[in-house]
């Protein structure tokens, strides 16, 4: 179902895409940020992903007051599906993705737009906030970097965040790219594919995207009960790394270690009894054990820990415990 407040007469320079799912009144914070933008030659595409609260009615009210705002509604499938629909509906020469409950600087669209024009992808700072306190920041200064440099920064999770937010993409390079059918970690796979379509990427610290971290959000829920989609995404990333000899070995180390940050707590919570997530993680570690053991960036102690886990043992608190099937 579609709710549009006007026909598209002139093509906007930028399409802003926001997936909506049970965000309630928190959407007003991001709408206020967009109203305050120094760059106003954009369209806003809101995609309601089957919200069960008042989100759709709130969005209908919002678009009535803005000629360049549009609302599309669909059944619930996840953020990946909502963003893909947004891409299909976008009319802008450039696209950027926002989340409804985050914030951006007033010069966000202007800075990203001008930096994106020369390289087709622009990346800015992303500040992670929890309870009004900045707890971390991805920042790469002001520079143009090669595709290989950008992929390294993305995969080692330094300077460039893994999500689609804090970035702008030209429509021509995103034309055939879509978010994969995953509930989580679909974002890093999307960004990875986009980065592979350009030779250079512009990085700027002249504007910031503010990620408002909540324990009740997707990542908070995922830490407590991780989805096997994380394993599927890790497998795709490991295959990608294996095919790219130009990438840093640290990419392997960080990718494997990141999965273990989910796997170890699951094993402890399950009292060292096997479950689907544990068993599939073990299979993945066994599949890539040669890469793990050959990785020069990985400390030998962690190689031993991953080897033990792959064969049914967990090292924790200086003890080795067997995972029961």
Enumerate the language-model features and the residues they cover.
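Donor-binding/catalytic cores of nucleotide-activated saccharide
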Residues: 79-80, 100-202, 211-226, 299
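Membrane-interface aromatic/basic loop that binds lipid-linked glycans or pyrophosphate carriers
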Residues: 2, 271-325
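A conserved acidic beta->alpha catalytic loop
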Residues: 33, 48-58
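Glycine-rich, basic loop-to-helix element that forms the pyrophosphate-binding segment
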Residues: 74-90
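Short, well-formed alpha-helical segments that are part of the catalytic scaffolds
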Residues: 22-36
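Short aromatic/hydrophobic "clamp" motif used to bind/position activated sugar donors
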Residues: 95
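Short beta-strand/loop segment that forms part of the nucleotide-sugar
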Residues: 42-50, 70-75, 100
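Catalytic core of nucleotide-sugar-dependent glycosyltransferases
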Residues: 208-214, 220-247, 261-289
